[in-house]
Amino acid sequence: MPTNLFRFILALMLLPLLWTGAGAQTVSFPELSSTLPGRTDVTYLDLAKTVIPDLASDGQGFYKGGLPIEMRHIAGPDSGGSPPETSSFPNAAVLPIKAGGKDRLAMLFDLGDSPDSAEGYAILALYDVTAKPKLLDAANVAVDRSTYFREPNKLSIGAGDDMLITMSTHFNSSQGYVITPLIMVRDDRFELIDMIYTFDERLCAYSRKQDVAFQSIADGRPYAAVKVTVTDSTVPSDESCDDAPPEASSRDISVTYHWDKKTSRYVADSDALAKLSAENEKRF
């Protein structure tokens, strides 16, 4: 099956997860040829071409283009791979956000596989569309094969600021790997807060799932604290298996990120999620 078709089918399968609750009202997948709300002079394709200059419709419901503009990886210069020489996708995820008290528009483009990395290549672009559209920033945010916004997609961390939540994932027959970057915008530039690593598996005797919840907590600092809770649940199956099923169990692992004025970044109050990631690696 062609890679881009597989990604399209996977995206359809993940829609219930990606569009749950508040996410259904915030992320959209407009036709790229359509104009922005309240505008007649700018299309989403116009915005997309600021990061993929030769992007054009193939007349069959997809948009094809060559190399994107140069950009950094959100996790730093030692992360990520090269972009594909050509890419094809049906649409892009669009998310209105607040940054620095201003209205901004984020768009997420999954370009497919990287030619020199196991990770894919996904562009997160930031636009000012209040007047003449302007690309403010763009970064590769892929940290696994397929990349999306993750519900709730954004989280308010101040009266005029939102944190963005993306996810990169891949699956095999019994395991699901998910990495969730938390990204803020400062001075119209994306900054990585942290990445949350979770791991699901479904075996004959049991299934184990790790769900993630996010909460902002006002604490009197320039940006609100962000509490991340991973609920790690094990559910025994009713199947007849060689191995005895474990007992049902559930535990919450939480970390709160506080804004540190001295370092001008978010700092975790514990290494609990890092320890969970290390535990998960032993089960791969």
Which stretches of residues belong to each language-model region?
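Bacterial N-terminal signal peptides that target proteins for export
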Residues: 1-10
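Short beta-strand elements that form the blades of beta-propeller/WD-repeat-like
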Residues: 104-110, 161-169, 222-230
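Structural signature of eukaryotic scaffold interfaces centered on beta-propeller domains
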Residues: 90-101, 150-160, 213-221
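A glycine-rich, hydrophobic loop/mini-helix early in the fold
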Residues: 103-157
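Acidic, small-residue rich beta-repeat scaffolds with periodic aromatic anchors
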Residues: 24-76, 172, 177-284
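Bacterial N-terminal signal peptides
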Residues: 9-18
